[in-house]
Structure formats: structure tokens, C-alpha cells
């Protein structure tokens, strides 16, 4: 196969991996956790995955502790937890 063909194949595989939906079996288990504000008293706007609505939603994080269902951006949450 030519180098151009290999690059095309690599590009298609990368695109497929990005666009393939996340199933419940592929979703990290921490996505199923309820949002946890943690033990500190900050008021940071963060994003968590809501298993019931299958959407990323806002919660307020204290700044320390908590769990891994805690994202800085909508895109990070969607890419990690939301099935498309």
C-alpha cells in the first residue's frame, strides 16, 4: 500500500474512533457517580455527567476531594462519558 493510502487509512480510523458512540459498557465507572462537592469551601463551577439524563450538567465544586466525575469543560465531560 502506498504512503498516501496508509495516511488515508490512518485518518479514517482516527475519525471513526472519535465519532463512535460510547456505550454503557465502554463508559468509565466514575461517570456513574453522583457529583461530589468535596470537603473544601470553594465555589467552583464544574461539569459532571448525569447518568439519568445522559447529559453533562453543572455543579459547584469546593476545590478539594470529591470524585472523578468532575470536569473542567463540557467537551471533556461529553468525550469521556456521553454516548452520542
UniProtKB/Swiss-Prot annotation:
Q: Where is this site: Reactive bond for trypsin?
A: 41-42
**Membrane-crossing residue ranges in chain numbering:** none
Annotated signal sequence is 1-24
Q: Which Pfam families match?
A: Kunitz_BPTI (PF00014)
Xref: SUPFAM superfamilies: BPTI-like
Compartments annotated for it: namely: Secreted
One Gene Ontology term of the molecular function aspect: serine-type endopeptidase inhibitor activity
Alphabetized, the UniProt keywords read:
Disulfide bond, Glycoprotein, Hemostasis impairing toxin, Protease inhibitor, Secreted, Serine protease inhibitor, Signal, Toxin
Location of the BPTI/Kunitz inhibitor domain: 31-81
Which cysteines in this chain are paired by disulphide bridges?
A: 31-81, 40-64, 56-77
User: Which tissues does the record link to its expression?
Assistant: Expressed by the venom gland.
Tell me if Glycoprotein is a UniProt keyword of this record: yes
Q: Which domain of life is it from?
A: Eukaryota
Q: What Gene Ontology cellular component terms go with this record?
A: extracellular space
Residues modified by carbohydrate are 70
Asked if Glycoprotein is a keyword of the record, the answer is yes
Q: Which family does it belong to?
A: Belongs to the venom Kunitz-type family.
Instruction: State what this protein does.
Output: Serine protease inhibitor that inhibits plasmin and trypsin.
Instruction: Provide the protein name.
Output: Kunitz-type serine protease inhibitor B4
Organism source for this protein? Answer: Daboia siamensis
Amino acid at each position: 500500500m502506498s504512503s498516501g493510502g496508509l495516511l488515508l487509512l490512518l485518518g479514517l480510523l482516527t475519525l471513526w474512533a472519535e465519532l463512535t458512540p460510547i456505550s454503557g459498557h465502554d463508559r468509565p465507572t466514575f461517570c456513574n457517580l453522583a457529583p461530589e462537592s468535596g470537603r473544601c469551601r470553594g465555589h467552583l463551577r464544574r461539569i459532571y455527567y448525569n447518568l439519568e439524563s445522559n447529559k453533562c450538567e453543572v455543579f459547584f465544586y469546593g476545590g478539594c476531594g470529591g470524585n472523578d466525575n468532575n470536569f473542567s469543560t463540557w467537551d471533556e465531560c461529553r468525550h469521556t462519558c456521553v454516548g452520542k
